[in-house]
């Protein structure tokens, strides 16, 4: 088959959305029209719910992709837990998600190596592909449990994940171990630290990739668009959730570049987008997924993505754009970007560096946020409300291991010593 003669033009501005029977979906579609969104990744309980929703969206000129959880169960979780407890993912300690919890109760990931699991997923995808009018399939939770959570989530669970720990390191189902030993001649558990074994990590990534590409084959056989919502970059995702999505046969990708989960600075979006331009599958059109911000940061984030190679935006979710002023600005923004895309032959041309800068000290926004946090700590210790002025000395590196870089710096004004730790997954300052 020859190369495509023309690039398919996908909707440019998207939202993810949960759909439930009885909701006023028509009014949401009207709001999407009003602010310039033309694509929706819809999560509905059954194929019949999509059959009800699609005509409403199409009336408003909005394309609909079925937003489907794959390796993690959703609507059929309790049924499968009861009928097939042997299907569930196992961690390095030998604990199965069939009878243990990782972070939250709804994390019930399946083992991708099992033929029965693959067949179950394939039949599920087929059932949604048979929905007339559905434009595409967007897979989510297509991965293992997070061996490392984004840094801002650690306090919520009372944890520090400065390296890979056994309780959150999944992929040790007996069938996974059997297949790996068959291919490589050893059991990864025999090593002092299996997390350092690149072959074992890549093997788990490849199992997830095989299932993704099986899904893509089904989706394409129905003439529909194949999409996914993975972690921020292939390198980060491979480390954090075993999701090497640059190898997936996607038509369009919506990486979840949620800066508030990581550094809190829009430079995270710029860096990830630069890395994604480099590492995505050549056949895949790159978009950027981001959290909704009801203020100026929304537009700074979209600029960071579109100026560095993304071809469009997905917002989680439209409900986060609340103020009339932000909605007006969003509409003006979408109109202006579409004009630029049309003038450039259907693509957003961007000038961006070859690689992201992994030096945290060169990221002004990250350093500013960190110094504000230091000022808050000093003021609180002194019983004051006003932020304290800083006189920081030199940052001294005190430790470095895996993706972790540890520094100390002294504030001469308060004589406070701060421990500062940066995390770098892939080529991106991640937290």
Positions of the model-derived regions?
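Short, acidic/polar
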Residues: 18-32, 118-127, 235-246, 295-304
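Substrate-binding cleft/loops of secretory-pathway carbohydrate-active enzymes
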Residues: 225-263
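Active-site-adjacent "subsite" loops/lids of carbohydrate-active enzymes
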Residues: 66, 70-127
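Catalytic domains of carbohydrate-active enzymes, especially glycoside hydrolases
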Residues: 22-46, 132
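The substrate-binding groove and active-site-proximal loops of carbohydrate-active enzymes
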Residues: 16, 37-44, 103-119, 197-207, ...
